[in-house]
Amino acid sequence: MAKTLTERFYQPKELKVMGRWSVEDVTVNDPSLRPYINLEARLLPHSHGRHAKKAFGKANVHIVERLINKVMRSGATSHKAGGHFMRRDDRSLMSKKMKAYEVVKEAFMIIERRTKQNPIQVLVRAIENSAPREDTTTIAFGGIRYHMAVDVSPLRRLDIALKNIALGASAKCYRNKTSYAQALAEEIIAAANADPKTFAYSRKEEIERIAQSSR
C-alpha cells in the first residue's frame, strides 16, 4: 500500500527554534511587551521580509529573527558621542543573514552552557530589563523648544532593547579577541541579570532618568 504524502515526510512532535530550543515554557512577565514578543514554534526564524510593508508588521516577526536582523546592522566602536556608540564602516554582517543566524545560534549555545537555562527565556528577560518605559520628545511652544517626558510604545520598547543589546555586543568585541557570538552571549546574560555594567541596561536607565528629569 502506497504511503500518503504526510506519512512520507518526518513530522516532529514539537518544532524547536534552530532545531534545539523549545518555546513552550518561555514566559513574558511584562504585560505590555507580551503581545509583541512573537514566540511561535518555528524551526527557522526567517520570514523572508513578508511583513516589511505592513503597518506594525514586525510585531509578527519571531523574536529570534528580530535579534538576527539587529545583528546584521553596522557595528559599533568603543567610542561614544552624545551617549551613543559611534558606528564603524564594518560590513562583515550587513545583509548576511545566514552568517548572522550562525552568530546568534552560537551565542545561544554559550548562554545555555553558562546558565543551564533556555537561551530564548534568557533573551526575553534581557529584553524586559532593557526596554525603556519613558523617553523624551521635543515640543515647540511659542517659538521655544523644550523636552517633555512621554510614554514609549511597546513596539518601540522592543526595538530599543534589541538594538542596544546588539550594539553593546558589537562594542564589546571591537578590536579585541572576543568573538561577536561570545560578546552577544555575555551582553544578553548580563542584561537578563539587570547588570548596570551592560550597555543595554545602563542605556535604558539613562533614558528613563532623563525622561524623569523632564517631567
UniProtKB/Swiss-Prot annotation:
This is Small ribosomal subunit protein uS7. InterPro entries: Ribosomal_uS7, Ribosomal_uS7_arc, Ribosomal_uS7_dom, Ribosomal_uS7_dom_sf, Ribosomal_uS7_euk/arc. Belongs to the universal ribosomal protein uS7 family. The keyword Ribonucleoprotein applies. It comes from the Archaea. One of its GO terms (biological process) is translation. GO terms for cellular component: small ribosomal subunit. Keywords: Ribonucleoprotein, Ribosomal protein, RNA-binding, rRNA-binding. GO terms for molecular function: rRNA binding; structural constituent of ribosome. PANTHER family: RIBOSOMAL PROTEIN S7. HAMAP family: Ribosomal_uS7_A. Part of the 30S ribosomal subunit. SUPFAM superfamilies: Ribosomal protein S7. One of the primary rRNA binding proteins, it binds directly to 16S rRNA where it nucleates assembly of the head domain of the 30S subunit. Is located at the subunit interface close to the decoding center. The keyword Oxidoreductase does not apply.
